[in-house]
């Protein structure tokens, strides 16, 4: 019996070694196959230097948008110049380009493979924020070696919130300003990435399905979707290139609704208030605000919890009437329904409690929607497969904000992921971009395009 055990043990050990060897061989083969697939894409890719030069050309164009009045379309000369430049660049690459009267630049690239595959659409925006100075942007390219970055007019310190990412960026190529303006990486990073993709897929031999691109104006004033033409841009899988950092992918976001209400008052002497029908609009609007449930205030929510916030109160010219604006944000549609019920009941209570105050809804409706509701089922598996090939570790997020893709969803377009683009400290004079993160986004998108046609 002991002899039998020894013989079985030797076979067992031999079998274990064989299995381990087989697993190791499979692992090496898998790694090699993945690397080979990635190299297939990279052999068509432009260089980091070419992307940097393109980016520097784009940030030299001051393309700030502005907040319009109700009766004007906010197209600026800088955005027109940027749109003209993008359209010209795409035409030089022999792409099918349309520059619309509203300033959108559409690029359509037909499939060059026989089988039917979903259309991938990629979007970014050409404007930069009007909230921070942007005249005379002076970019500096720096190979970061650690420590404080001297901008000339201020610093970026790794020990401050503005420098929180720097410790992970040693050895990377950073582009920053002189500290008096923004850089414009939000979203000139995206513009450079998209144009680099257009250049690459136009090269002979790069196989791809149908591709659509759009460079939007007015995103930073919340109007990227206002005049988009879905006859030119109507993809199955939508990707928005506008997130910060080098790993983030937003796969869901707040749905945003807004409500603006006017409370019309009538002032009389308090002694005769009952007889003369005092309409105390200030008391009415205060009651409306006070009845908002405290557990749904923004400061009491996190993660995928939504909120209600009455945020802007304005006294009108008659001094006795007021408008109040309320925002609601949610991920879950059921929570959104509950928030709307609360607001309706709240307004009804105010009407009954202040019968002489006229309560008028001036504006209400959807501002942007959670992309998760309508996202193509292949979107997330596709980006995961591409990330595996590129050996990029992604950080999937539920974004407590809106995105360009979320704005576009209100126009009937499918929900889209938002992808990192190498931006940091956007909307501030401490803004900087990271070239290697931009390049990672570019390679990842190319790999997605390659992956889906296979």
For the regions a language model picked out, list residue spans one by one.
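Active-site-adjacent substrate-binding region
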Residues: 283-300, 307-309, 358, 366-418
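Active-site metal-coordination/substrate-binding segment of hydrolases
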Residues: 115-207, 215, 235, 440
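A non-catalytic alpha/beta surface segment that caps or lines the substrate-entry region
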Residues: 68-127
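Sec-dependent N-terminal signal peptides
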Residues: 18-26
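N-terminal capping segment at the start of a domain
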Residues: 41, 46-77, 175-176, 424-428
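Positively charged n-region of N-terminal signal peptides that target proteins for export
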Residues: 2, 10-18
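Midchain, well-structured core segments that form catalytic/ion-binding scaffolds
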Residues: 166, 172-182, 218-338, 348, ...
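Zn-dependent metallopeptidase/amidohydrolase metal-coordination segment
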Residues: 318, 394-447
């Amino acid at each position: 019996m002991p002899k039998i055990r020894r013989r079985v043990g030797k076979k067992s050990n031999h079998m274990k070694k064989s299995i381990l060897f087989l697993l190791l061989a499979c692992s090496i083969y898998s790694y090699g196959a993945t690397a080979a697939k990635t190299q297939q894409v990279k052999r068509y890719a432009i260089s980091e230097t070419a992307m940097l030069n393109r980016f520097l050309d784009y940030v030299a164009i001051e393309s700030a948008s502005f907040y319009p009045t109700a009766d004007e379309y906010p197209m600026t000369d800088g955005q027109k110049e940027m749109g003209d430049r993008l359209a010209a660049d795409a035409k030089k690459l022999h792409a099918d380009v349309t520059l619309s009267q509203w300033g959108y630049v559409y690029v359509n690239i037909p499939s060059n493979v026989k089988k039917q595959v979903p259309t991938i659409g990629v979007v970014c925006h050409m404007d930069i924020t009007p909230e921070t100075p942007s005249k005379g942007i002076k970019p500096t390219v720096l190979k970061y070696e650690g420590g404080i970055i001297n901008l000339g007019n201020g610093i970026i310190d790794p020990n401050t919130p503005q420098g929180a990412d720097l410790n992970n960026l040693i050895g990377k190529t950073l582009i920053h300003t002189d500290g008096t303006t923004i850089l414009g990486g939000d979203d000139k990073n995206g513009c450079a990435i998209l144009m680099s993709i257009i250049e690459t897929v136009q090269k002979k031999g790069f196989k791809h399905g149908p591709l659509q691109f759009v460079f939007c104006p007015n995103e930073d004033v919340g109007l990227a979707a206002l005049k988009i033409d879905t006859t030119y841009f109507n993809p199955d899988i939508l990707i928005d290139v506008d997130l910060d950092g080098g790993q983030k992918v937003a796969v869901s976001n707040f749905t945003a609704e807004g409500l603006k209400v006017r409370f019309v008052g009538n002032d009389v002497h308090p002694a005769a208030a009952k007889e003369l029908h005092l309409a105390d609009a200030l008391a009415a609007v205060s009651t409306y605000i006070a009845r908002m449930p405290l557990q749904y205030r923004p400061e009491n929510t996190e993660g995928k919890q939504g909120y209600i916030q009455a945020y802007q109160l304005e006294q009108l010219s008659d001094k006795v009437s007021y408008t109040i604006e309320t925002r609601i944000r949610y991920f879950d549609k059921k929570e959104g329904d509950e928030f709307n019920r609360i607001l309706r009941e709240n307004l009804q209570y105010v009407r009954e409690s202040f019968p002489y105050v006229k309560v008028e809804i001036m504006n209400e409706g959807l501002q942007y929607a959670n992309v998760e509701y309508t996202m193509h089922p292949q979107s997330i598996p596709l980006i995961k497969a591409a990330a595996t090939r590129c050996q990029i570790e992604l950080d999937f997020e539920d974004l407590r904000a809106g995105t360009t893709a979320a704005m576009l969803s209100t126009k009937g377009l499918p929900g889209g992921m938002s992808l990192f683009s190498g931006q940091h400290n956007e909307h501030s004079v401490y803004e900087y971009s990271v070239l290697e993160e931009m390049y990672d986004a570019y390679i990842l998108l190319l790999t997605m395009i390659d992956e889906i046609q296979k």
